[in-house]
Design a protein with these regions (language model features):
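C-terminal juxtamembrane segment of a hydrophobic transmembrane alpha-helix
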Residues: 8-40
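N-terminal export/assembly leader peptides and their processing motifs that target proteins to secretory
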Residues: 27-157
Protein backbone atom coordinates (compact mmCIF):
# COMPACT_ATOMS: atom_id res chain seq x y z
CA UNK A 1 0.00 0.00 0.00
CA UNK A 2 2.88 2.32 0.81
CA UNK A 3 4.33 1.75 -2.64
CA UNK A 4 1.05 2.73 -4.29
CA UNK A 5 0.86 5.99 -2.32
CA UNK A 6 4.50 6.85 -3.06
CA UNK A 7 4.02 6.03 -6.75
CA UNK A 8 0.86 8.17 -6.91
CA UNK A 9 2.63 11.09 -5.22
CA UNK A 10 5.58 10.78 -7.63
CA UNK A 11 3.23 10.70 -10.64
CA UNK A 12 1.39 13.79 -9.37
CA UNK A 13 4.70 15.58 -8.76
CA UNK A 14 5.95 14.63 -12.24
CA UNK A 15 2.77 15.83 -13.97
CA UNK A 16 2.86 19.08 -11.97
CA UNK A 17 6.53 19.68 -12.85
CA UNK A 18 5.85 18.99 -16.54
CA UNK A 19 2.91 21.40 -16.51
CA UNK A 20 5.06 24.10 -14.90
CA UNK A 21 7.80 23.62 -17.49
CA UNK A 22 5.32 23.84 -20.39
CA UNK A 23 3.60 26.88 -18.87
CA UNK A 24 6.92 28.64 -18.37
CA UNK A 25 8.56 27.82 -21.72
CA UNK A 26 5.60 28.33 -24.08
CA UNK A 27 5.59 32.17 -23.90
CA UNK A 28 9.38 32.28 -24.22
CA UNK A 29 9.31 30.08 -27.33
CA UNK A 30 6.49 32.20 -28.79
CA UNK A 31 8.45 35.44 -28.30
CA UNK A 32 11.58 33.87 -29.71
CA UNK A 33 9.81 32.61 -32.82
CA UNK A 34 8.26 36.05 -33.42
CA UNK A 35 11.75 37.57 -33.23
CA UNK A 36 13.05 35.06 -35.76
CA UNK A 37 10.12 35.76 -38.13
CA UNK A 38 10.64 39.54 -37.86
CA UNK A 39 14.36 39.11 -38.46
CA UNK A 40 13.70 36.95 -41.53
CA UNK A 41 11.32 39.59 -42.93
CA UNK A 42 14.01 42.28 -42.51
CA UNK A 43 16.60 40.10 -44.24
CA UNK A 44 14.18 39.30 -47.08
CA UNK A 45 13.47 43.01 -47.60
CA UNK A 46 17.17 43.79 -47.63
CA UNK A 47 17.84 41.04 -50.17
CA UNK A 48 15.09 42.43 -52.41
CA UNK A 49 16.40 46.00 -52.10
CA UNK A 50 18.96 47.17 -54.64
CA UNK A 51 19.93 50.57 -56.02
CA UNK A 52 22.30 51.95 -58.63
CA UNK A 53 23.68 55.45 -58.88
CA UNK A 54 23.06 56.21 -62.56
CA UNK A 55 24.87 59.54 -62.75
CA UNK A 56 26.44 62.16 -60.52
CA UNK A 57 28.01 65.42 -61.62
CA UNK A 58 28.87 68.84 -60.26
CA UNK A 59 27.51 71.94 -61.99
CA UNK A 60 29.93 74.10 -59.97
CA UNK A 61 32.12 73.80 -56.87
CA UNK A 62 29.15 74.04 -54.48
CA UNK A 63 26.33 72.26 -56.35
CA UNK A 64 25.97 68.74 -57.65
CA UNK A 65 23.19 66.48 -58.84
CA UNK A 66 22.84 62.71 -58.63
CA UNK A 67 20.30 60.27 -60.06
CA UNK A 68 19.74 56.98 -58.25
CA UNK A 69 17.56 54.13 -59.55
CA UNK A 70 15.71 51.51 -57.51
CA UNK A 71 16.70 48.32 -59.35
CA UNK A 72 15.51 45.95 -56.63
CA UNK A 73 12.19 44.16 -56.19
CA UNK A 74 11.18 46.05 -53.04
CA UNK A 75 9.89 49.57 -52.56
CA UNK A 76 12.19 51.78 -50.50
CA UNK A 77 10.47 53.67 -47.70
CA UNK A 78 11.76 56.50 -45.53
CA UNK A 79 13.96 57.91 -48.30
CA UNK A 80 14.65 60.94 -46.07
CA UNK A 81 16.70 58.63 -43.81
CA UNK A 82 19.15 57.75 -46.61
CA UNK A 83 22.85 58.54 -46.25
CA UNK A 84 24.65 60.54 -48.95
CA UNK A 85 28.38 61.31 -49.04
CA UNK A 86 30.90 62.89 -51.37
CA UNK A 87 34.57 62.13 -50.88
CA UNK A 88 37.78 62.49 -52.81
CA UNK A 89 38.63 59.21 -54.46
CA UNK A 90 41.88 59.03 -52.48
CA UNK A 91 39.94 59.49 -49.22
CA UNK A 92 41.64 62.73 -48.14
CA UNK A 93 38.38 64.70 -48.10
CA UNK A 94 35.01 63.47 -46.85
CA UNK A 95 31.75 65.46 -47.02
CA UNK A 96 28.72 63.97 -45.26
CA UNK A 97 25.45 65.41 -46.58
CA UNK A 98 22.32 65.89 -44.46
CA UNK A 99 18.72 65.84 -45.64
CA UNK A 100 17.03 69.23 -45.47
CA UNK A 101 17.65 72.88 -46.14
CA UNK A 102 19.02 74.13 -42.83
CA UNK A 103 22.52 72.66 -42.89
CA UNK A 104 25.72 73.60 -44.71
CA UNK A 105 26.24 70.35 -46.63
CA UNK A 106 22.79 69.09 -47.57
CA UNK A 107 20.72 67.13 -50.02
CA UNK A 108 17.13 67.49 -51.13
CA UNK A 109 14.77 65.60 -53.40
CA UNK A 110 11.24 66.11 -54.66
CA UNK A 111 10.43 62.44 -54.03
CA UNK A 112 7.76 61.77 -51.40
CA UNK A 113 6.44 58.40 -50.24
CA UNK A 114 7.70 55.01 -51.37
CA UNK A 115 10.44 54.76 -53.95
CA UNK A 116 9.05 52.13 -56.30
CA UNK A 117 10.81 49.47 -58.34
CA UNK A 118 12.34 50.89 -61.52
CA UNK A 119 11.97 54.53 -60.45
CA UNK A 120 14.88 56.97 -60.78
CA UNK A 121 15.08 59.75 -58.19
CA UNK A 122 17.01 63.01 -58.56
CA UNK A 123 19.00 64.33 -55.59
CA UNK A 124 20.23 67.92 -55.44
CA UNK A 125 23.42 68.34 -53.41
CA UNK A 126 24.49 71.68 -51.92
CA UNK A 127 28.01 71.95 -50.56
CA UNK A 128 29.28 74.65 -48.20
CA UNK A 129 32.00 76.93 -49.62
CA UNK A 130 34.44 75.62 -46.99
CA UNK A 131 34.05 72.10 -48.42
CA UNK A 132 33.74 73.18 -52.08
CA UNK A 133 34.75 70.72 -54.79
CA UNK A 134 38.12 71.29 -56.42
CA UNK A 135 38.52 71.48 -60.20
CA UNK A 136 40.27 68.50 -61.77
CA UNK A 137 39.74 66.22 -58.77
CA UNK A 138 37.99 62.85 -58.86
CA UNK A 139 35.17 62.35 -56.36
CA UNK A 140 33.18 59.39 -55.11
CA UNK A 141 29.45 59.89 -54.56
CA UNK A 142 28.01 57.32 -52.13
CA UNK A 143 24.33 56.60 -51.50
CA UNK A 144 22.96 54.24 -48.86
CA UNK A 145 19.32 53.32 -48.23
CA UNK A 146 17.89 53.27 -44.69
CA UNK A 147 18.34 49.48 -44.57
CA UNK A 148 22.02 49.67 -45.58
CA UNK A 149 22.03 48.86 -49.30
CA UNK A 150 24.62 51.11 -50.97
CA UNK A 151 25.87 52.20 -54.37
CA UNK A 152 28.70 54.51 -55.49
CA UNK A 153 29.57 56.58 -58.53
CA UNK A 154 32.90 58.18 -59.49
CA UNK A 155 32.89 61.59 -61.16
CA UNK A 156 35.42 64.32 -61.92
CA UNK A 157 34.78 68.00 -61.38
Amino acid sequence: MDKIIVTALLVIAGVTAAALVVTTLTPIIGKSSRSVVDSQKDVATRIQTDIKVIKAHASDAENATAWVKNIGNANIDFIHLSDLFISLEDGTKFIPLTNGTSTDNRWTTDKDGSWTKGETVKFVLSIDSGDALETGKTYLFSFSTPNGVASEYIFTY
